[in-house]
Amino acid sequence: MNYLSNITTSQRPWLLLALAALGLELSALYFQYVLGLAPCIMCVYQRLAILAIFSAGAIGAIGHQNIVARILAYVLWGVGAIWGLIIALEHVEMQKNSGSLFFSCEFIPNFPTWAPLHEWIPFLFEATGDCGEISWRFFNYSMPQWMVVVYALFSIVFSIVLINRLVCAKKP
């Protein structure tokens, strides 16, 4: 119990989080530029969520001794993991209902006007694919289904670490 509570005050777990997210970002770029799979708008949003998790890991690794840095890292990790899970679940639902008349997939990301990431970093955030298209499977799971697993794991680990940290911090 105490180990989990103190895990975020050391650098290694934060580096592991950053490396896991970096691996996922690099995998996304591999799928896009080597295998030729065009990312859809939901893929772009999921990339942004992974980028938030990567940022959490990097900030936590650099500032693991600083409470403000750790709080910022927790916030980015939680937001990235939970928002990513929600987006991935929506993406799976879109793929399930892609033949429906009510199915719609935007082509321009809904980023704030002050941060048009798809214009600033198009190689990473430009959506050129169709959300309903399933062009890749692994063990009969589509990419969004695998991302549900990934984000669920990130969310579960986040919840366990955060709850443990809060419970142990309250003990005298």
Curated annotation (Swiss-Prot):
Organism: Colwellia psychrerythraea (strain 34H / ATCC BAA-681)
Subcellular location: Cell inner membrane
Family the entry assigns: Belongs to the DsbB family.
Stretches of the chain found on the membrane's Periplasmic side: 31-48, 90-145
Molecular function GO labels: electron transfer activity; protein-disulfide reductase activity
InterPro entries documented for this protein: DiS_bond_form_DsbB/BdbC, Disulphide_bond_form_DsbB, DsbB, DsbB-like_sf
Membrane-spanning parts: 14-30, 49-64, 72-89, 146-164
Protein name: Disulfide bond formation protein B
Any single Gene Ontology cellular-component annotation: plasma membrane
